[in-house]
Amino acid sequence: MRKLLIQIIRLYQRFISPLTPPSCRFYPTCSAYGIEAIETHGAIKGSYLAIKRILKCHPFHPGGVDPVPECQHTKHKKTP
């Protein structure tokens, strides 16, 4: 599922985005944010974060730098 969502975003970046003027108010762009969010948090939470970000992309939001939040869970190594 993760790979499929990333491929859809990459298709958008390659074929649709070049046809429109640059208008993203954020860094990284919303599509780059979506890919990073899905890679970092998985398909469900990453998609949620990407949609939440896209909904903030409008003329009344100041934009700016908005990095993908770090993963909150940590994996514990078992020690012998």
UniProtKB/Swiss-Prot annotation:
GO cellular component, as recorded: plasma membrane
Membrane topology listed for this record: Peripheral membrane protein
Subcellular location: Cell membrane
Cystine pairings recorded for this chain: none
Any single Pfam family the record assigns to this protein: YidD
InterPro entries listed in its UniProt record: Membr_insert_effic_factor_YidD (IPR002696)
Keywords (A to Z) from UniProt: Cell membrane, Membrane
Main location: membrane
Sequence similarity: Belongs to the UPF0161 family.
Function summary: Could be involved in insertion of integral membrane proteins into the membrane.
Full protein name: Putative membrane protein insertion efficiency factor
